[in-house]
Design a protein with these regions (language model features):
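The Walker A/P-loop phosphate-binding site
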Residues: 23-130
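Short, small/acidic-rich helices and loops at N termini and domain boundaries
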Residues: 1-31
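Substrate-engagement module of ASCE P-loop NTPases
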Residues: 196-214
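Short beta-strand segments at enzyme active-site cores
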Residues: 176-179, 211-216
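Conserved small/polar residues in nucleotide/adenosyl-binding loops
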Residues: 219-228
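Conserved inter-motif catalytic segment of the P-loop NTP-binding fold
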Residues: 106-192, 196
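A general structural signal for stabilizing positions within well-ordered secondary structure
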Residues: 64, 166-167, 204
Length: 230
């Protein structure tokens, strides 16, 4: 698989169909060689020099996002979660303060990928316009620091594959938005599916050294928590 540091430009013709992180979800058996490789990769030694992950988003003096982690906006349906995310993204695009959010993405990690899994193209475009207006960007020119996709018409499995592909294709990504996390699953009450999606999120944040922010409704959170407590 071509890595993010490869000099050759990644295209659909020279890329593998999925990353190692996603392909692992479909495997039940691992060879000793694979297990040794994964175990070695995960080993942490006292002599390792591990730097503090960059803090990239703040509300006042409180850090709300760092590289290598993911977070979520939660609330009832139609509770302005998307507006909250719009303000966050607007701050991140310009590395300034927008409403209550302040952003400080490092150079070389300024690109933002936004995936909406629920809304129509019309409503997705409204969200994108709102971000541009909040950040003071001109609507007459596309800003290459922010890429936006609507994935409403695709299956959960294809949505995961498309996000995975975008992460492998685009360099210098510091922030990923997934508005509609539950749409990466067929059944929100399926414990294995929920664990698999969380595992992929953790892998993406670690492998690509970025932050993922998602939107989740209380209804979906309660459904999964009820299932987990049975």
């Amino acid at each position: 698989m071509k890595t993010k540091n490869s000099k050759e430009q990644l295209t659909p013709d020279n890329m593998e169909s999925q990353s190692l992180e996603v392909s692992m979800l479909n495997k039940d058996n691992f060879s000793d060689k694979e297990l040794e490789s994964y175990l070695s990769k995960g080993e942490i030694k006292a002599t390792d020099k591990i730097t503090i992950p960059p803090k990239i988003l703040f509300v006042g003096d409180c850090t709300i996002a760092t590289f290598g982690n993911f977070s979520a906006s939660t609330g009832k349906a139609k509770s302005k979660k998307t507006f909250n995310i719009s303000a966050m993204v607007a701050a991140a695009v310009t590395n300034t303060t927008v409403l209550n959010y302040r952003a400080d993405l490092p150079e070389g990690k300024r690109k933002i990928l936004y995936f909406d899994t629920e809304q129509s193209k019309f409503h997705c475009h409204n969200v994108l316009e709102r971000i541009y207006k909040l950040s003071g960007l001109s609507l007459q020119k596309d800003d290459c620091r922010l890429l936006f996709w609507g994935l409403r018409e695709y299956t959960p499995k294809l949505r995961i594959a498309l996000i995975d592909y975008a992460l492998r294709k685009h360099d210098e990504v510091g922030l990923v938005i997934i508005d509609g996390l539950r749409d990466l699953m067929y059944d929100i009450n399926n414990g294995k599916e929920a664990t698999d999606v969380m595992t992929v999120l953790m892998a993406w944040t670690s492998v690509y050294e970025l932050h993922i922010h998602t939107a989740v409704s209380y209804t979906h959170l309660r459904a999964h928590e009820t299932k987990a407590n049975l």
